[in-house]
């Protein structure tokens, strides 16, 4: 992650750098992104930028964390213990829908987050993003296990398989939305996001709940 002094950078300059980086990573992915283009768009010199971040990987980690905060990808106020069998799936659906709607005017925020998927497992585990990835995985796993405890997510299959199913549907839905973003209204985004959530529910619901 960036050096501690990055947080002392003037908020307007910090946001300008992170927004430029988000646009670049969303457009070109991590591998194709150019730190020179980012710095030019943000009106930063290399000397100034490297005073705050060590390299492109460091800047990417900071950008991902910032994008996640901007769209509230992880809901810090979520109380898993308060969820019931009746509120679990509506809450799940809302938690998927709302970050997408918050991205509606700035789709590059979501696009930059999607660029994380291009990194190999070793980089995700050991690189600057390791802490953020661990928090995200714990968030998702906590949600899955709460659903199992409530009896609304099946518990007869390995967690890894259930997560793989959910991830595949989530990625497919998000990729389609991003590819068609400019033609979609907020209502379209919400409706399609909810359809994907419904498919995710059907994929992991216990057999006796599949038609619920």
Which residues are covered by each model-predicted region?
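Short secondary-structure transition hinges
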Residues: 94-141, 160-163
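Short, basic, alpha-helical segments at the C-terminal edge of helix-turn-helix-like DNA-binding modules
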Residues: 65-71
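Helix-turn-helix
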Residues: 16, 24-58, 62
């Amino acid at each position: 992650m960036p050096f501690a002094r990055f947080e002392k950078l003037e908020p307007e300059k910090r946001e300008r750098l992170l927004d430029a980086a988000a646009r670049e990573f969303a457009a070109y992915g991590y591998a194709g992104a150019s730190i020179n283009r980012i710095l030019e768009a943000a009106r930063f010199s290399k000397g100034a930028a490297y005073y705050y971040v060590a390299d492109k990987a460091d800047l990417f980690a900071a950008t991902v964390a910032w994008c996640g905060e901007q769209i509230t990808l992880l809901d810090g106020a979520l109380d898993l213990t308060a969820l019931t069998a009746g509120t679990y799936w509506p809450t799940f659906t809302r938690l998927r829908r709302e970050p997408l709607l918050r991205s509606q005017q700035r789709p590059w925020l979501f696009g930059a987050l999607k660029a994380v998927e291009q990194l190999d497992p070793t980089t995700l585990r050991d690189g600057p993003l390791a802490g953020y990835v661990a928090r995200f995985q714990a968030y998702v796993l906590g949600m899955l296990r709460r659903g199992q405890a409530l009896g609304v997510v099946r518990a007869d299959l390995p967690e890894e398989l259930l997560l793989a199913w959910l991830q595949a549907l989530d990625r497919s839905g998000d990729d389609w939305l991003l590819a068609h973003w400019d033609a979609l209204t907020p209502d379209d985004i919400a409706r399609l996001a909810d359809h994907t959530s419904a498919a995710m529910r059907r994929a992991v619901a216990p057999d006796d709940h599949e038609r619920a």
